[in-house]
Amino acid sequence: DSEFAELKIRGKIFKLPILKASIGEDVINISRVSAEADCFTYDPGFMSTASCQSTITYIDGDKGILRHRGYDIKDLAEKSDFLEVAYLLIYGELPSSEQYNNFTKQVAHHSLVNERLHYLFQTFCSSSHPMAIMLAAVGSLSAFYPDLLNCKEADYKLTAIRMIAKIPTIAAMSYKYSIGQPFIYPDNSLDFTENFLHMMFATPCTKYKVNPIIKNALNKIFILHADHEQNASTSTVRIAGSSGANPFACISTGIASLWGPAHGGANEAVINMLKEIGSSENIPKYIAKAKDKNDPFRLIGFGHRVYKNYDPRAAVLKETCKEVLKELGQLENNPLLQIAIELEAIALKDEYFIERKLYPNVDFYSGIIYKAMGIPSQMFTVLFAIARTIGWMAQWKEMHGDPEQKISRPR
């Protein structure tokens, strides 16, 4: 039997259908409130609003659970590779061996970008942020694929593959241009993560030998950042897509949203915070500053809009961070890691943070890993965008298959 919630306005009662979730909280359908009750609901920041139906990602923030298509994020990070997870998000199931091989071949086939795109990079000044370059380059792909300006259902999967394939190439090109080095073409004999590292760090006169520990760590980071429900950038992609905008334009809006320091830029801010703290001896002083409402200092990398428990992605990255630094001989003498570990230990025992459920999030350790790999801080958000592209494309594809989809129009 159908269940209803009752809303009483000015003495009149309105019945609102309660929709049963397959997992997690049920929702109240308020879509008819404005038409029937002559008023609107008000929810700043969409704190209590579900904007769509989705079967891609599930989060239980109280229990610290994150699942993609029913698979636990820790299992995916430990047992899968990034393109397996990409296939899972886009198609709904993990691939068979044959499906995986075909998928990886298709991604490799589309990894090149049009040579004319190289000229776009030359229009930027040498000090341009890689995210600014990437944002423009991804949007410009619309000019190279005019046949996709009005996507049909048959094009959705090919579009997703093209985007997944070209994003790391554009990301590496953005980095190379920002440091004045020539672009490095993709090498289709390498897997996805190896190829990105190759394009980042090889030069025409020096080959780059991929360290398997580094590759595996980056693979985990990509998986952990692949999708995360209807966050700011994903919602931006969906809103842009709801108007019928082409997929390249939609992804560029996601990149723009991700660039914000409260979203994708947080791991860079964590590095700056750890540098500011400077040493373990200063941690108590900065803990006190974080508690002081009148002090502008804030502990970055703690707390999350959804998680009221330990972020499961942070748990994986903490161990991955130790593996990378051990491989690079930095485990015992990396000052940022030592500060981070001690800061976490102190915060997790402090009643102030416990009461407010402020636990380390995914940004707390990822920046330390990137820095140890030799990836500069201005590239941190670029790498986030590479990973999140598969989530954006899966959400974009799902949105176009939703019979209830309408153009987004908040009041």
UniProtKB/Swiss-Prot annotation:
Pfam family, one: Citrate_synt
EC number: 2.3.3.16
Alphabetical list of SUPFAM superfamilies matching this protein: Citrate synthase
Pathway entry: Carbohydrate metabolism; tricarboxylic acid cycle; isocitrate from oxaloacetate: step 1/2
InterPro entries from the UniProt entry: Citrate_synth-like_lrg_a-sub, Citrate_synth-like_sm_a-sub, Citrate_synthase, Citrate_synthase_AS, Citrate_synthase_bac-typ, Citrate_synthase_sf, Citrate_synthase_typ-I
Recorded catalytic activity of this chain's protein: oxaloacetate + acetyl-CoA + H2O = citrate + CoA + H(+)
PROSITE patterns found in the cross-reference section: CITRATE_SYNTHASE
Catalytic center residues: H304, D363
Enzyme class: transferase
Keywords: Transferase, Tricarboxylic acid cycle
Superkingdom of origin organism: Bacteria
Biological process annotations from GO: tricarboxylic acid cycle
Molecular function, one GO term: citrate (Si)-synthase activity
Any one of the GO CC terms: cytoplasm
Gene3D superfamilies per UniProt: 2.20.28.60, Citrate Synthase, domain 1 (1.10.580.10), Cytochrome P450-Terp, domain 2 (1.10.230.10)
Annotated NCBIfam families: cit_synth_I, PRK05614.1
UniProt miscellaneous comment: Citrate synthase is found in nearly all cells capable of oxidative metabolism.
Family: Belongs to the citrate synthase family.
Name of this protein: Citrate synthase
Higher taxonomy: Bacteria, Pseudomonadati, Pseudomonadota, Alphaproteobacteria, Rickettsiales
Name of the encoding gene: gltA
